[in-house]
A protein has these predicted regions:
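Conserved hydrophobic helix-helix packing surfaces used for dimerization/oligomerization
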Residues: 6-8, 39
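Short, histidine-centered active-site or binding-site loop motifs used for metal coordination
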Residues: 10-12, 129
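Donor-binding and catalytic core of enzymes assembling or modifying cell-surface/extracellular glycoconjugates
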Residues: 23-110
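A short, glycine/small-residue-rich beta-strand->loop->alpha-helix junction that serves as a flexible
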Residues: 13-20
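Nucleotide-sugar donor-binding and catalytic loop/hinge architecture
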Residues: 1-6, 33-34
Length: 157
């Protein structure tokens, strides 16, 4: 199968919106068993985001990862445009990638669902055990990597 370019939007506007590295890593493990992938990691310089980035870069997937944290927005936009799919916390990158026409799986852990499903290019994933999501859901540890993987396969098929 051809290589797929995946944007991982690790950035989040606050600690309750940043899905832990483990969830991204578990998803990466699932997807690389079925597809040849390149991962583009979108983070800010915030210390918590850098920790998540370093945790991902210390895995066996590091050679397939490209960190975007030293690039300007002008340099990042064409990279996003060349991704086949994007998996982002509810953050600037989920809005940018869906706005650029990229199918975007939005990890909704702590904000109203509307923020992550207003575009036909957005596919929200909500925490396990919830029927919807809002400002105090605090579900970042309950985002299920299997559901992300299932959604990716549905989009790509």
């Amino acid at each position: 199968s051809k290589e797929i370019n995946i944007l991982l939007g690790i950035v989040g506007s606050g600690p309750t919106k940043r899905v832990p590295a483990k969830i991204f890593i578990d998803f990466m493990r699932l997807v690389t068993q079925k597809h040849k992938c390149r991962f583009f990691l979108a983070t800010g310089k915030n210390i918590e985001e850098q920790k998540i980035l370093l945790e991902i870069l210390s895995t066996t997937f590091k050679n397939n990862c490209y960190a975007l944290d030293n690039l300007s927005l002008n340099e990042i936009l064409p990279i996003i445009k060349n991704c086949n799919i994007s998996i982002c916390n509810d953050s600037s990158f989920s809005h940018l990638s869906s706005g650029l026409g990229i199918d975007t799986i939005v990890l909704m852990s702590d904000t109203p669902l509307l923020y992550g499903n207003y575009s036909p290019k957005m596919y929200p994933i909500i925490p396990d055990g919830e029927n919807t999501v809002t400002h105090d859901t605090r579900g970042k540890d309950r985002i299920n990597p299997d559901k992300i993987f299932e959604q990716l396969n549905n989009i790509l098929s």
